[in-house]
Amino acid sequence: MIRLPRPAARILLVDAAGRTLMFRFTPDDRPPFWCTPGGAVDPGESYEQAARRELLEETGLDRDCGPQVARRQVEFRTIEGVEVEADERYFRVDVDAHEVTGAGHTALEQRVMQSWRWFSRAELAAHAEPYFPTDLIDLLDATEPTHV
């Protein structure tokens, strides 16, 4: 099977309570799943620019996403049904609190990404529905800011 390359920026949005924002996807062709904010890098965009754009579009938060904190290569089928090999770059954004607005969601996102919530690590570990990345808890632990 040929997979299309898909550069993508993903955001680990973490509030002051240590909870991570996740979106619930309900595609027509598979069971629901949860995912961090983010998406494909548009032509001419850097990963950093894509992270900032995706953060604004999906959450309403307009700010710099800081440096890349992780990178993964993953294969999956997009919501549109395209088989891809994604080069995902992760950016961590820590906020005191944030009320998500879906005002920037595309028509497709409005249809398949109808809910979101903030998860603690314990809630993620006990959650019945799949979430991506599957090693999110380890990724959050590895990117936790250190205080000197």
Regions of interest found by a model, annotated:
Residues 28-29:
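A short acidic/small-residue loop/turn micro-motif
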Residues 20, 32, 100-102:
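Intrinsically disordered, low-complexity acidic/polar segments
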Residues 1-20, 40-43, 64:
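Conserved N-terminal beta-strand and adjoining loop/helix that marks the start
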Residues 34-39:
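Conserved acetyl-CoA binding element of GNAT-fold acetyltransferases
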Residues 41-64, 72-129:
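Unchanged
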Residues 127-148:
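Charged phosphate-binding loop/patch that engages nucleotide di/tri-phosphates or the phosphate backbone
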